[in-house]
């Protein structure tokens, strides 16, 4: 057995030990946590079990189907912890193979598994862990494609497309991912020549068209809107609610109701964000519209407001984009029985959030710098997979900020480790260069 093989096994053992022990401890001491969205996912899961007869289209089917298959909250919690372990091991493999060093692989894996924003989400009955899992598998497949020319077959493209599509059906803000992956893997530079490979384009887009396109067609047939869900109009109001007083008199009833609820929300929370969810029942009662008619109407109103208030819309997009990088941790300190450990965890989370926010800022600066400077690209030895990660994060930050303005910090969670991986690569690139020089001297 070579020294390198021993090192790989040693660091893999360290990663496994830490990841398993952390999740066992979490499962034994911290319960599954429900949020305001959880009940709607459970309702949709019941509809899945009944053959979609009463499926209301408010949620894409990925997470409800997962809940339907797995069952009770505690079982879902355990399953999500298992998914977190698989994600951790995937980062170990990618870090190991990309750098050739098991220490870097272990650092990448532990950066994921020790991030409270990740392991606490594995306890939350929300979509993030499942979305992270499907995205990780899609990126893992893309890594294999880029690093192993012999694997560049249609079947691998289909698997990548399947995972990216399931990520979309779990968290619809990732609807761009199949197209992004297909385009990125289809084009490559050999020397100074741009090469095109049709296999990833066909392989990745085929399951996306069948799964995501098929689902959107189902929504269109049943609810008369071509969208991943029936909530599009409500999400747009998250943007336009800031200037809803400019809604035309034609929709005065909806406008006035929203403004009343907005004022109340600002008094209670200091922000108008998520006002629409409180206002929906009153809007339906006043207009006689059902949930879907109201969503379509609010979408029409919001599109008009955006067209007539482009700079206000842009300012909210930029605000949402900035919030995207804030590295939140969704957890419930009240369920930790021992006050001492709850206090320790609060300190740990504060420190982790500060470090992650700094990492996010470094990511923004270094990706922009690398895009401009050829010298930096060469110095940092940026492989195509690093650019794939960077592009995925940037696209998510922009796309999510355009579509919604409410829980923007939450939108980065599935790709937070991709940001950390990029920054770790920047930090270690000098060491990689020295190792390469040492091998050449030998």
What is the predicted role of each segment?
Residues 78-99, 137, 141:
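Transmembrane-helix motifs of polytopic, lipid-linked glycan transferases
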Residues 123-131, 170:
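Short acidic/glycine- and proline-prone juxtamembrane loop motifs at membrane-interface regions
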Residues 91-114, 132-133, 149-155:
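Transmembrane-helix signature of polytopic, membrane-embedded enzymes
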Residues 29-43, 53-66, 74, 226-229, ...:
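Extracytoplasmic catalytic/substrate-binding loops of multi-pass membrane glycan-assembly enzymes
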Residues 74-78, 287, 298-299, 304-390, ...:
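Membrane-interface anchor segments at the N-terminal boundary of transmembrane helices
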Residues 228-331:
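Membrane-proximal stem/loop segments at transmembrane-domain junctions that anchor or position
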Residues 99, 138-159, 185-186:
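Membrane-interface transmembrane helices that cradle and orient dolichyl/undecaprenyl
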Residues 19, 105-116, 140, 164, ...:
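Short helix- or helix-capping micro-motifs
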């Amino acid at each position: 057995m070579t020294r390198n093989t021993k090192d790989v096994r040693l660091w893999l053992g360290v990663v496994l030990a830490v990841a398993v022990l952390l999740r066992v401890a979490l499962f034994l001491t911290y319960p599954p946590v429900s949020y305001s969205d959880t009940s709607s996912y459970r309702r949709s899961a019941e509809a899945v079990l009944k053959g979609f007869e009463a499926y209301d289209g408010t949620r894409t089917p990925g997470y409800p189907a997962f809940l339907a298959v797995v069952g009770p909250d505690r079982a879902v919690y355990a399953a999500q912890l298992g998914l977190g372990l698989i994600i951790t091991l995937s980062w170990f493999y990618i870090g190991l193979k990309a750098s050739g060093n098991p220490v870097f692989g272990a650092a990448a894996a532990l950066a994921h598994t020790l991030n409270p924003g990740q392991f606490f989400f594995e306890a939350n009955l929300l979509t993030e862990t499942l979305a992270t899992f499907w995205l990780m598998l899609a990126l893992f497949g893309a890594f294999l494609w880029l690093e192993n020319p012999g694997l560049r077959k249609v079947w691998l493209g289909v698997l990548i497309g399947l995972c990216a599509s399931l990520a979309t059906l779990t968290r619809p803000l990732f609807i761009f991912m199949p197209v992004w992956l297909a385009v990125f893997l289809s084009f490559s530079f050999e020397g100074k020549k741009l090469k095109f490979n049709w296999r990833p384009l066909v392989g990745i887009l085929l399951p996306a068209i069948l799964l995501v396109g098929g689902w959107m067609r189902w929504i269109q047939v049943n609810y008369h809107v071509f969208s991943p869900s029936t909530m599009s109009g409500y999400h747009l109001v998250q943007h336009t609610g800031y200037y809803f007083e400019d809604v035309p008199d034609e929709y005065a009833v909806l406008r006035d109701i929203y403004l009343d609820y907005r004022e109340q929300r600002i008094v209670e929370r200091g922000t108008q964000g998520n006002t629409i969810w409180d206002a929906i029942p009153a809007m339906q009662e006043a207009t006689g519209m059902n949930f879907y008619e109201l969503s379509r109407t609010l979408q029409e109103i919001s599109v008009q407001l955006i067209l007539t208030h482009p700079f206000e819309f842009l300012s909210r997009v930029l605000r949402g984009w900035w919030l995207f990088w804030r590295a939140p941790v969704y957890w419930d300190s009240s369920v930790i029985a021992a006050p001492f450990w709850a206090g320790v965890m609060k300190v740990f989370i504060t420190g982790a959030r500060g470090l992650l926010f700094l990492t996010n800022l470094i990511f923004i600066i270094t990706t922009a710098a690398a895009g401009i400077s050829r010298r930096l690209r060469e110095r940092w030895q940026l492989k195509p997979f690093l650019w794939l990660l960077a592009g995925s994060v940037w696209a998510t930050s922009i796309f999510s900020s355009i579509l919604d303005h409410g829980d923007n910090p939450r939108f980065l969670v599935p790709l937070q480790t991709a940001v950390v991986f990029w920054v770790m690569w920047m930090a270690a690139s000098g060491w990689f260069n020295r190792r390469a020089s040492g091998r050449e001297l030998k």
